[in-house]
């Protein structure tokens, strides 16, 4: 007699803006359920991004298995699509071993790809892309960003206006398909990963508190040696940095110190900009999560008692 296929256990997802306490909560939950952590962070996957990527401590990594941490070399391609596919495979493998997964991170496209799946987007069109790049060179990011904001404000709100790669791609998709990225993603609404059930919790806090935490964490990173880490990367990967082709080397916390090392800004300005750019990034993360994902928001724990209480609640969820 055939037995019914066993239902997959739910996957706990913990998301939120940077500095909201996701990693600590994920570790606490994983300990309670005997699970493993799937890191949804596009920088933590790379070796050598340590302090600037706010990687878990060596003790945390030794205590609970963290997937997608220290698995790639800088410059090695790894897309959101790669993450979505590989993360789903690892979660299913964990389930077969009788273990559960805790997904934690703030990389918006990693999370969307895993939880919702991606819309089928068209391949690049060389002619359209060349024309848009020409417009970018002549008119600058600001005008192209305004053009995107008029056509797809939800997508525009999730982008850094100073970065051109996703801006150009978003406009290219509109010209090729006649539809915006937001419209295509809304049409997709499909699960790509079989019977996986994601229970998504978002960590919320007052904006002033979040910004204070960001500023404090930046100061702690500086004290821990972030500048020396950035300086080492600057000298080792100078050609890659200058090429602008490796997006991870353009990320917050590193690019500002690279500008200082290039003699473009002062050290104090670099620190100030890291804080400012991190706050801007947190705002874009929140916009994305509210616009593109279905999230159960809860107050972020601000002390050890609140952390343990929330971890206990999540561990006993569906």
UniProtKB/Swiss-Prot annotation:
This is tRNA dimethylallyltransferase. Belongs to the IPP transferase family. Its cofactor is Mg(2+). One of its GO terms (molecular function) is ATP binding. It comes from Pelodictyon phaeoclathratiforme (strain DSM 5477 / BU-1). Signal peptide: none annotated. Monomer. Catalyzes the transfer of a dimethylallyl group onto the adenine at position 37 in tRNAs that read codons beginning with uridine, leading to the formation of N6-(dimethylallyl)adenosine (i(6)A). It comes from the Bacteria. The record marks 107, 129 as: Interaction with substrate tRNA. Its EC number is 2.5.1.75. GO terms for biological process: tRNA modification. ATP binds at residues 16-23. It catalyses: adenosine(37) in tRNA + dimethylallyl diphosphate = N(6)-dimethylallyladenosine(37) in tRNA + diphosphate. Residues 41-44, 165-169 are annotated as: Interaction with substrate tRNA. Substrate binds at residues 18-23. Keywords: ATP-binding, Magnesium, Nucleotide-binding, Transferase, tRNA processing.
